[in-house]
Swiss-Prot record:
It comes from Procambarus clarkii. Thermostable even up to 100 degrees Celsius. This is Myosin light chain 1. Keywords: Allergen, Glycoprotein, Motor protein, Muscle protein, Myosin, Repeat. GO terms for molecular function: calcium ion binding.
Length: 153
């Protein structure tokens, strides 16, 4: 699996892994698998992180770089499921005027009730960080929101 990676990808993985190697001994707590993958511009769901060995608690499992490289390769290979374009198409369904905007309240509803749901306590910081101000009619442009959420800016 790692043979599918370019030398540049392997170097990027080594660098990102080293950031989460807090002990400096070539290992990383599996709790940080998702964070490390996100640092490598991947956006795995919680289900994917769990599937590849990520843990919900610290110190449940320790992995080596040699174990993480194939994890990265697999998630990178599968990243087309749920691409930026797919998410854009979903948000366009809520763009009734076809002008690049949607109701702020609808976005809140989507984030609280569909897919990997956010908790109410998680919602406010996400919207504050990623959303432009809503206009006087309660609409926001959804493309800047999506770009920030998928780290494409």
């Amino acid at each position: 699996m790692a043979a599918d990676l370019s030398a540049r990808d392997v170097e990027r993985v080594k660098f990102a892994f080293s950031i989460y190697d807090f002990e400096g001994n070539g290992t990383m707590d599996a709790f940080y698998i998702g964070d490390c993958l996100r640092a490598l511009n991947l956006n795995p769901t919680l289900a994917i992180i769990e599937k590849v060995g990520g843990k919900e608690k610290r110190k449940e499992k320790i992995i080596k770089l040699e174990e993480f490289i194939p994890i990265f390769a697999q998630v990178k290979k599968d990243k087309d499921a749920g691409s930026y374009e797919d998410f854009m198409e979903v948000l366009k369904l809520y763009d009734k005027s076809e002008n690049g905007t949607m109701m702020y309240a609808e976005l809140e509803h989507i984030l609280l009730s569909l897919g990997e749901r956010l908790e109410k306590s998680e919602l406010e910081p996400v919207l504050k960080e990623c959303c432009n101000e809503e206009d006087e009619d309660g609409f926001i442009p959804y493309e800047p929101f999506l770009k920030k959420m998928t780290q494409l800016l």
